[in-house]
A protein has these predicted regions:
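Membrane-proximal helix-loop-helix interfaces that form the catalytic/acceptor-binding platform
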Residues: 6-497
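Short, Lys/Arg-rich, polar N-terminal cytosolic tail immediately upstream
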Residues: 1-3
Length: 499
């Protein structure tokens, strides 16, 4: 197979990637994390850092960008997701650039194609969060580091400092990417270790203003709230399934939820991908510098997060790791090329057939993602429409937690009396007062004949029972609607309680 016009092929791949990411961008309802992003972006500039320090577990760059973007494009669903879609498309081009640094044009194009049509990349690219931006910056900083080591220069190192700092200012996982860079430099580019350490001094100085807020996040335990403590939620099989074909099939985990198939079943499902990755790594053993450049971000991130998860210090959701997909894609493409090369004389046809076979897994996932209304949980738009349609003036809205309030009120902006409960599990110490008492319930029943309960995860059976016991004496249920991840109940005050 002749690769005479890689530029034209790359342009076509980027065009396909753009269509996949910008199509139906506002179709799905925002879920809580996106609504939180929008809510932070609607606050005053000077309030963003204190809000993140008090109630978030991420650094501020993506929130500042969202704040600026909302001022330009508004806070509609498509507008909120536009920046992620742009970053996701840019990552396709950067994946090609990285692959070409370490391999051939076919591997570069195939890597870009894998990322371009990946359901996992599409989902992250249509998520108004920081994951797509992190992926772009991880690739850009890696390319900048290679340029620094190969050609040097103050300007190139300065550019690397800015990109590395931006990576860590986007997500704390960015620090693991930069750590992988340091290991690579120390092992394979020892003459450039001193300049890299000097660059890290520059990154540290740029990061210093955020240090007090980072300390507050750690002290407040923002990264491990009550409903995550003691849980083990790092599922390598689900993560690899998402990278391989978008998960969601054969009992594999999805973008939001863990899977139901056991480890043996996961290995069987993922076996073709595992073999291809193994061949990719094996074919690179003669150029371990390139293999390490591509593989270390994956290895360092995996070891660090697995260690923290096994120790039950932190938990991690597979969707957080979408920034590693380009590195996976390069290794997969290298493996496909190696396997196809064994068909002498028919290498091009074999490569096309193998690629189509592996990527065909993702077609039904994309079909469900775009066209199955039940594929994505947390339809807050539908929940708000229900209350808007059936609600009456003066109805009281009772949110079981702040997550429900922020996500629901993104869509439901009509003024209504409301209360957001704080679970007692979120309070520290043994003497934790109940967030909602029977006295409060009776007071509500006297003032508000109708009450809507709007609930979302985390909403444990204990919380349900506590809330039921407070309300059942003064209210009776008259209606309910269950959505994926959302519960909406309508209650009316009993006659005796409303007097």
């Amino acid at each position: 197979m002749k690769w005479r016009a890689p530029g034209a092929a790359l342009a076509g791949i980027i065009a396909v990637a753009a269509v996949l990411r910008f199509s139906l961008l506002g179709q799905n309802s925002l879920w809580f994390d996106e609504a939180w992003m929008a809510w932070i972006g609607q606050q005053r500039w000077q309030d963003i850092v204190p809000l993140l320090a008090a109630g978030d577990a991420h650094p501020p760059l993506s929130y500042f960008l969202m704040k600026a973007w909302i001022g330009i494009a508004g806070d509609g669903e498509s507008a909120l997701r536009f920046l992620s879609a742009c970053c996701s498309v840019l990552s396709v081009a950067l994946t090609y650039a990285l692959a070409r640094r370490v391999s051939t044009a076919p591997v570069g194009l195939l890597s870009a194609f894998v990322v371009g049509v990946s359901p996992f990349a599409v989902m992250a690219g249509q998520d108004a969060r920081m994951y797509a931006l992190l992926g772009t910056l991880a690739l850009a900083s890696t390319l900048a580091l290679v340029a620094c080591c190969e050609r040097g220069g103050v300007l190139r190192w300065g550019g690397y400092v800015l990109l590395a700092a931006a990576t860590i200012y986007t997500h704390y996982f960015g620090g693991l990417v930069i750590l992988a860079h340091g290991i690579w430099v120390a092992w394979y580019e020892r003459p450039h270790l001193a300049p890299w350490l000097l660059a890290m001094g520059g990154v540290a100085s740029l990061y210093l203003p955020w240090a007090p807020s980072l300390w507050h996040q750690i002290a407040n335990e923002n990264g491990w709230p009550w409903y995550r403590r003691g849980a083990f939620v790092l599922h390598p099989g689900d993560l690899l399934g998402l990278m391989a074909f978008g998960g969601s099939l054969f009992g594999m985990g999805s973008y939001f939820f863990p899977g139901t198939v056991g480890p043996a079943g996961q290995v069987l499902i993922l076996l073709p991908f595992l073999v291809t990755l193994w061949r990719g790594a094996a074919s690179w053993m003669s150029d371990r510098r390139s293999l390490a450049l591509v593989g270390l971000p994956f290895v360092v991130t995996g070891v660090a997060t697995a260690s923290a998860s096994f120790a039950r210090v932190l938990i991690f959701y597979p969707r957080w790791f979408s920034f590693l997909l380009p590195f996976y894609a390069v290794l997969l493409a290298r493996g496909l090329e190696d396997i196809a090369g064994r068909w002498q004389g028919r290498r091009g046809e074999a490569l096309a057939l193998l690629t189509a076979g592996l990527l065909a897994f993702g077609v039904p996932v994309l079909d469900r993602y775009y066209f199955d209304p039940g594929f994505r949980p947390y339809p807050w738009r539908a929940a708000a429409d229900l209350v808007r349609r059936e609600g009456r003036p003066g109805d009281f809205l009772l949110f079981v937690n702040g997550s429900a309030e922020i996500a629901f009120t993104y869509y439901f902006r009509e003024p209504h009396p409301s209360l957001a409960l704080t679970p007692v599990e979120a309070a520290e110490g043994a003497d934790r007062d109940p967030a909602f008492t029977g006295i409060q319930a009776r007071a509500l029943a006297k003032r508000y004949r109708r009450l809507w309960i709007i609930a979302t995860v985390p909403f444990t059976p204990d919380q349900m029972e506590r809330l039921r016991s407070r309300l059942e004496q003064v209210y009776q249920a008259v209606g309910a609607r269950i959505y994926p991840g959302i519960w909406v109940h309508l209650l009316e005050a009993r006659r005796a309680a409303s007097r």
